[in-house]
Amino acid sequence: PVYLLGFAVCFQGFQIALSKITAEKKAAGIVDAAKTTLRLTIILTMVLCFIFSFFCFVYADKICAVFLHEPACVPCLRLAVLVLPFVGVKNCIHGYCLGVGNSYVPALSLCLEQISRVSSIFLLSIFLIEKMPVAAFLAVCGMAVGEIVSFFFTVIYYLLHKKSDHVKAGSGSTVSKRSLCYELLSLGIPLTLNSLSVTLLQSVQSILIPMMLYRFYGNRYRSVEIYGILSGMVLPFIMFPSTITN
């Protein structure tokens, strides 16, 4: 829940705003303004990610004890928040690519992320499983590897293709950084607040359900196991038809 909260606070709303602004500037033929918006979004995202990651890394003990009621999650949380800046930059570039109509870069990046995640978890489970502080740390390591691989692929692709845009620049039309920043914030802040409210409700659900299961079973590990089965196997199977209809 804390990691997903970082998504909502740091870049989720601004990624959507970036896609919208980029599409507008592309339609107007102002390529430089779209690229400037991307740079502004990356800077803003990096600042928010570093602040959030620093806070969570330093106070991981208190966060896990007070909110998660599971001190064993401390190494998992600390590793997860260290990856957050990479995820933020990657998602900003994905938003820019979607804005210019290039959807295969985010799709390919997601495929590489999943392949890297599963492969790294498999290899770590063979060679380093006994050295893991907790079993869940293995999954977090796989998540971190997948996100970093996806980050490098996305950044390298953008650096190689940033000069080969299909959109021709407008005839001398420019937009000031101040107006772009205002447009980004005016769109991004409401979207961020909306995403934050949804994520907070989901986080409360993710925390309360295991707590209530613990009250019922009287065993912390059994309650977490049941919750993992419900959220990871039962609910995705029940909700699978909605992935087709949506």
Model-predicted regions and their roles:
Residues 109-123, 131-161, 231:
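Hydrophobic alpha-helical transmembrane segments
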Residues 146, 150, 154, 158, ...:
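Transmembrane helical elements of multi-pass membrane transporters/channels
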Residues 69-92, 230:
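Alpha-helical transmembrane segments of multi-pass membrane proteins
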Residues 51-71:
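Short membrane-interface helical motifs at transmembrane helix boundaries
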Residues 1-23, 85, 203, 231-246:
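Small-residue-rich midsections of specific transmembrane alpha-helices
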Residues 9-43, 99-104, 245-246:
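Transmembrane-helix boundary and interhelical linker motifs in polytopic inner-membrane proteins
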Residues 30-47, 55, 181, 185, ...:
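Interfacial transmembrane-helix starts/ends
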Residues 86-109:
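Membrane-interface junctions at transmembrane-helix termini in multi-pass inner-membrane proteins
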